Design a protein with these regions (language model features):
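Beta-strand-dominated extracellular/periplasmic modules and repeats
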Residues: 1-159
Length: 159
């Protein structure tokens, strides 16, 4: 991680679809999905570039068609950061829905009790420009891997 370029992650709206107490799981991929698989990975760091171990990275999103599961926990779950502040969770690139570009909601629960609520966006989406919540510093860095795509996103929180 290049500490010289760190900026605090943007605080963005939770939206109406958050559900408390999701399951802990490192893959949100459903067996019959037709979506593009992506591993979202990165670090939780303080503004002075120190890793945050044991942070809970809570993720929820629409499926590949742009629909949220409001009755169960499909495309909802969390992972914990390791001793180096690293997290990794497998999912699919979510679909758009009216007024919103592709995005993944995230709450980062710090051991101190502080919470960062934000959203992660994907590059190259024409709908980014028309989404009123879209924030450029929450744009994932995408790369291709042997099994699909990787979205690199570091979460930088106040000390």
């Amino acid at each position: 991680v290049d500490c010289s370029t760190l900026k605090l992650s943007a605080e963005l709206t939770e939206g109406p679809y958050y559900k408390a107490n999701p399951p802990q799981k490192n893959s949100l991929v459903e067996a019959n999905t037709t979506g593009t698989r992506v591993v979202m990975t990165g670090y939780v760091l303080t503004a002075d570039c120190k890793p945050v171990a044991n942070a809970k990275v809570d993720v929820w999103q629409a499926d590949e068609k742009g629909s949220y599961d409001n009755s169960g926990y499909k495309y909802r779950g969390y992972v914990m950061t390791d001793a180096n502040g690293k997290y990794s969770i497998e999912t699919v690139i979510p679909g758009e829905y009216p007024g919103r570009t592709e995005h993944i909601h995230v709450k980062v629960w710090l051991p101190s009790g502080k919470v960062l609520t934000t959203q992660v966006f994907f590059p190259g989406q024409s709908s980014n420009a028309s989404d009123g919540i879209y924030t450029p510093n929450m744009l994932a860095t995408m790369s291709d891997t042997a099994t699909g795509k990787q979205a690199l996103m570091n979460f930088v929180v106040k000390n």
